[in-house]
Each structure stands twice: as C-alpha cells, then as structure tokens.
Amino acid sequence: GDVYKRQAFTLHVGGEANGEFAGHAFHWDVPGAIGLELVRRLYRLGFDPAFTSTAKVDYAIGIPLTHLGHQGSVLPIFVNAYLPPQPTMERCYAFGQAIAQSLTAMGVRTIVLASGGMSHYPGTDRYSQPALEWDTNALARLKDGNLKSLLGYDEVELDDTGNIELRCWACAAGALGQRKPDIVALEPSWHHNYASLGWFTPTPPVSDFHYPSIQPELVALTTALHQIAH
C-alpha cells in the first residue's frame, strides 16, 4: 500500500484525512494552512519533507486516535519505517526537534502521538519470536526518561530485533525532549510486543547550573573579587 511509497517524512496538508481498516472508517479534519507553514519552516531548518493532500489514513494513525476517542483536528505525519533506505534514528530525533521548534515559533500547541509497535516480524519465519528481552531493556531506559537512548540503535539492530517502527518513537522523543513518562506499559504477545508511554505532566523548569554563566553587568565586579581572592 501507500506505506511503501513514502519519502523519509511526509506531512498531510489537505483539508481532511480519510481512511479505512478492518471495516472501520476514519475521518479527521486537517489544519492544512498550519501544515504548509510547518513544511516551509522545516525547509528552513534543513529538512525536506514531502507533503500530500490525498494520502489515506491507515491503521497506524486511525486505530490509536479511535481508541483515544479523538475527534478534533489532526496533522498526520508519515515516517518511512519500512522500505530501505529508512531515515536514521538520529535524523528522526532531529526531525522531531525541528517540528517542536517550528510549532513553538508558530504559537501552536499540540498533542504529540507516535504510533509504532515494538518487536514483530510480519511475513517472516520469525513471526512467533518477538524479542521480549530487548524490548524490556529498551523500555526501561525510556521509563527513566532517557529518550535519547533511542539514538543508540542503528538500522541493523532495529531490523534484527523487529523494531523498525521505533523510528516513529524517535521523532516523538525529539519533540518531547528528555522527560520521564507518566505512564509506561508493556503487553507481550506470541507474535508482537505492544508498549505504551504517555506524558501529561508539564515540562519542569530548567534547574540552575552549579557553575552559572557570568552576567555581563557583573563582569567588572567578578574580576575584582577574583583578583582580591588571588
């Protein structure tokens, strides 16, 4: 399907997004003007995402939003997690940072939702062998707020452990920054490990450094005190 025709990153900028999966029809309004402005700003920040007005919303977006009962507008962003060459985890994380920076500059507040399962191998002889130990260890690092731990996984490890969809997680991690999740859940199955993380606590203020920078108006005083002390 369309999932195999994506560039690294694609934004939906049409007025609405529709789709269907397993008999369930999906429909959400899309803030196209915001989407186009976001594309422009991402270009200026060194990213070249594609954009579409007609792409269908599949289960990866439709199911999570349906379970959440979301009925407001949605700005779908598609990530090529499947077809090599895929974007690196570093690039996905930086893309998330650029999205957050752009939306903040635009004065837009939003909820970030990333969809992608942990280890699974659909269509292969490893379908019944999800990597539970790997998933558990990876999730433990995220539970501690170490979202940058995702950057340590290269394309070989992601492919070998069936975790190619963590590229979507890396995009969300870049947008969120280093934060401990409020909710962490892991639900293993015989063919696919499901995990969920959620953040709803406001970002804490940045703590003062033990060695703060010198305020410009205090340079002369600081220099004099240093000379007296030595």
Where are these regions (language model features)?
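Short, small-residue-biased leader/transition segments that mark boundaries at the very start
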Residues: 1-4
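Acidic, low-complexity central loop/insert segments
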Residues: 16-54
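Glycine-rich phosphate- or other oxyanion-binding loops that anchor nucleotides, phosphorylated ligands
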Residues: 52-106
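Active-site beta-strand/loop microenvironment that shapes enzyme catalytic pockets
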Residues: 87-134
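Gly/Ser/Thr-rich active-site loops/lids in small-molecule metabolic enzymes
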Residues: 126-150
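Polyanion-binding loop/helix "lid" in catalytic or ligand-binding cores
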Residues: 141-186
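Long, Lys/Arg- and hydrophobic-enriched amphipathic alpha-helices
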Residues: 178-212
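Short, basic/aromatic recognition patches
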Residues: 213-229
